[in-house]
Amino acid sequence: MSSRRQEALDYHAQGRPGKIQVTPTKPFKDQRDLSLAYTPGVAEPCLEIAKNPDDAYRYTAKGNLVAVVSNGTAVLGLGNIGALAGKPVMEGKGILFKAFADIDVFDLEVGSENPEDVIRFCQLLEPTVGGINLEDIRSPDCFYIEQKLRATMGIPVFHDDQHGTAIISGAALLNALVVVKKEIGRVKIVFAGAGAAAIATAEHYVRLGVVRENIVMCDHKGVIYKGRAGLDEFKQRFAVDTKARTLAEALQGADVFVGLSVAGIVTGDMLQGMAKKPVIFALANPTPEIMPDEAKKARPDAIVATGRSDFPNQVNNVLGFPFIFRGALDVRAKKINEEMEMAATRALAELAKQEVPESVSRAYGGDKLKFGPDYLIPKPFDPRVLLWVAPAVAWAAVASGIAGRIIDVEEYRAELEARLGPERQVMRGLITRAQQDPPSIVFPEGDDPRILRASRILADEGIARPILLGDLDAIRRQADEASLTLEDIELVNPRTASDRDQYAQELWQRRQRRGMTQREAQARVLDPMYYGLMMLRAGRTDALVAGEEIDYPDAVRPALEVIGAEPGRKHVSGIYMMIFRQQTFFFADTTVNIEPDAQTLAEIATATARFVTRLGVEPRIAMLSFSNFGSVKHPAAAKVQQAVALLHEREPELQVDGEMQADTAVVERILTKVYPFAKLRGPANVLIFPDLDAANIAYKLLARLGGAEAIGPILVGMDRPVHVLQRLSEVPDIVNMAVIAAVDALEHRRHAGSTK
């Protein structure tokens, strides 16, 4: 069994099986809550809804609930595998809805291939959900099902396989034609593929301004031309008068190619006959009709888009459906109509022309993203997409008369910002950023099974280039037992490495006046931890992650000996990212400084602020205490006051204040009403604790009891990227830490001006 296959199976099976769950949104801790949540109290909202059905949006979750409905007849590239086998895909769709637009999902698999059964099933769901996303239903059934449901139901129904690609590629088409300076009403477009996505995309292009007669569509039998036998009603719409009978012939003189078919059906030679500055959308997944490098080699003047994240201009449906439904639900739209789809396309096209924030550019490798041939549409993890597409869709629903609720666009945009703050995108953005230029990361505990699995993930996902230290036979044996390949993973045994003597000499020179003898240095570099640190110091690797098999202090101590704190700092400190459903906090110092004085607290705050800023998040720092702005006279509170004074003096532009209690820091109402003089422009997202006791206890309680995902400890203040795991970390924790280390390494490289 391949490691990727096993990893996917483990991902779905570990812990609670599957990928989604139902979480209560109201307190439910005693008899009183029970009487309100259920009988007798629940009768009151029932009676209100009976009098006014619209009150269902006030008293139930209907307004934020979408059903993902499938019968499993066309599941991804797997075909007709059935409703039950397609369930993991539908759960995955639910994750995307939640992650990108905070929409709750019931995935509902219908055990019938009869379109009438699917239609009736969906119609009966109307009292339950606010919208229906049809998924993975074969053509032409999908057309009939969607048309019938849109005509008979009073909630949005949307078949993403049809319209998603149309909406996103439509934005790319508009902008590509701007770049090549061609008029949409004059271009000739050739489609490879005539399934649901191709038909819907072609129709959407016509609404954008493409002349229907200028579209040539090809299926597996060749060109769809007038008079060809066996065409269904949907293909008939695109039958044209032409002598072309093959895809190659159709491409002669074409301005645009849109591939929604299968891998490798287009060659470089076939592109030679296209018009000047051709636009090539090779959208088959995972392998396009022609690879971008091959297309550019054949036609250097071409603009190329694919469905892949490792090339420019990724046409990804996740840019559409979460935000389209968000806008539709928020105005209680009765349907998703053509005006709303068009609004989504034009919003995406316009957003791509705006200046891209540095935080988004950093997430995609640091190169400045700018509208042009390699940046036609926004990136999937650009948090601005929500703020552009959802309001555009919502307003289109209002303007076209199908909305049940009128909105103020600016107020609505503010609601969206509050619903999904940019911090929620942090980890996704970091992964994407690391993938742009994967650094090398050395793992001293190379034969640990969890380190091996994490390294396999990092290599497969293109996040980092792992280097595993240890006995090579032991590493290979562990990999074999775990059915893991070691492809693209470097193995090094410190005991036989050719540079061990050089590292021993360098270590001795660094520590000889700290009591280390030359013989001790020679012995130390045989230890994978010391050897890995020397690799990092010598520039042989970009970052180090360790601590899986040793206690935290025993991992930090060698790092301080070999690497040390960065110039100008006396202390290093540990941060935990605490990710909640709606926001992310940064806690410090959670791991290193037991009883920091005021000077050290100030240093911890500035180091944490710099780290948070590098993530693209504006730090709002609260210096915590049991006292609020001098309310208690005590040396412990005075220490925090002194740290705040130092920060105000040294970093006047930094949003930092205190001393303050924890609830004051995170509850905006308390902060603004009771302490309006505070420098924070909103609730704090960085919490600096007065000592290690408080910080360590707080993060562990919130991780175990408060539902937070804790990512860390992230070591800041080191001269080079060293990150230390908690002992016996699980594979996802190791991967998260490696992602942090990778981005840290890229930042160090950028600031050092290195071009390694």
Regions found by a protein language model. Give the residues of each.
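Glycine-rich adenosine-cofactor-binding loop
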Residues: 65-77, 82, 166-170, 180-206
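A short, aliphatic-rich alpha-helical micro-motif
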Residues: 126, 184, 250-251, 271-274, ...
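Adenosine-phosphate binding glycine-rich loop
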Residues: 160-161, 180-182, 282-390, 397-400, ...
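Rossmann-like adenosine-cofactor binding region
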Residues: 236-303, 309-310
